[in-house]
Amino acid sequence: MTPVSSRPRHWVIGDVHGCADSFEQLLKRLPAGDRLIICGDAINRGPAIEATMTRIWELVEQGRAVWLRGNHEQDLIQALRGGSWQQQRQLAGCDTFRHLGETNCRRWLERLEHLPLAYWGDGWVATHAGFDPVSWQPDLRVRMGFWQHYDGRFGEVVIGHTPGPHVRRLPHIVMVDTGACYGGELSAYCPETREVVAVPGLRPETPRALPGLRTPLSSGGAIAGR
């Protein structure tokens, strides 16, 4: 295990999406006394969803981690709370619901409902996708509108939500989702030092291509990791 650092820092971890093995490997690479910020979308997609949720919650209860809400957690909350046929159909297509079953999902519901939307650090903030460029409230689905209009008012914003081949930097924005569930990496970024730590993500027999999303990198680029 990496030694405890003299001054605890923060590590913002990208979308885990049920990749429990990668998450454990990443934990071994991070200083034991530092704070972990799970940047939402810990559930769905990967092969070990319940193990991922349980492990993260253990860290939350120990006071070591903060689990932020992502759009996948929000969708599950809304589907479990609703009774419409559209929401029941949404549950039927939810990986977490299929893996855990209705009883276990409902046991998790209150915890998920209390997940915060953002974590505010000293000169930086972590949130799942960004902020609405009109209200400047956390938005779990925003992409281009935030990337193009964020003016640095909150300092550096560290987000997940949009996967890419490496941790990317835009003006005042750092994007830490590196596609662990697509055969990419699971990455952690330290806002205090701008250091990146990454481990291999899921290695499926047939790798899934990253979603075809374009990220405006002309004013930024990759952040080297170790």
Residue ranges of model-derived segments:
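Active-site environment of divalent metal-dependent phosphoester hydrolases
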Residues: 17-22, 44-47, 72-78, 119, ...
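A short acidic-Thr-Gly-centered motif at the start of a beta-strand
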Residues: 1-6, 28, 57-60, 117-120, ...
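Divalent metal-coordination and catalytic microenvironments
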Residues: 15, 41, 70-71, 112, ...
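Active-site neighborhood of divalent metal-dependent phosphoester bond hydrolases
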Residues: 45-125, 140, 144-149
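N-terminal active-site segment of His-dependent metallophosphoesterases
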Residues: 1-55
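A general structural motif
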Residues: 7-9, 33-34, 62-64, 122, ...
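Acidic, His/Gly-rich catalytic cores of divalent-metal-dependent hydrolytic chemistry
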Residues: 5, 149-226
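Active-site-proximal beta-strand elements of phosphoester/diester hydrolases
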Residues: 10-17, 124-130, 174-176
